[in-house]
Amino acid sequence: MTHLHITTWVVALILLFVSYSLYSSGSAKGAKITHMILRLFYILIILTGAELFVRFANWNGEYAGKMILGIITIGLMEMLLIRKKKEKSTGGLWVGFVIVLLLTVLLGLHLPIGFQLF
């Protein structure tokens, strides 16, 4: 299940950049399609993350923090695309998104069911 969860968020990140670039180039139809597919992946990320949480969590703060950071990451992804669609500035959101994404990934790798890279 860990591999499925990682695959869904990697695909979601790719779809985020594709949707963002399509909104930037003015291709509204293509951007809308990829944005809707990305929303499907949000649901898959949440479902696989919840399944991992229920199956492996020993109910401590690190797991709850990881879950909260993951939901914040998804929220920032959606906010980035909506603001880009409305042609508003996204600079601050990008900074926040990168910081929260890094924290989420690092915490996920640190947890016992993550890959022990460090």
UniProtKB/Swiss-Prot annotation:
Alphabetical list of InterPro entries matching this protein: UPF0344
Gene Ontology annotations for the cellular component aspect, listed alphabetically: plasma membrane
Protein's UniProt keywords contain Nucleotide-binding: no
Pfam families for the chain: DUF1516
Location of the protein in the cell: Cell membrane
Keywords recorded for this protein, A-Z: Cell membrane, Membrane, Transmembrane, Transmembrane helix
Top-level taxon in the UniProt lineage: Bacteria
Membrane topology, as annotated: Multi-pass membrane protein
Transmembrane spans: 4-24, 33-53, 62-82, 93-113
Family: Belongs to the UPF0344 family.
NCBIfam families from the UniProt entry: PRK13673.1-5
Protein name, as recorded: UPF0344 protein YisL
Native organism: Bacillus subtilis (strain 168)
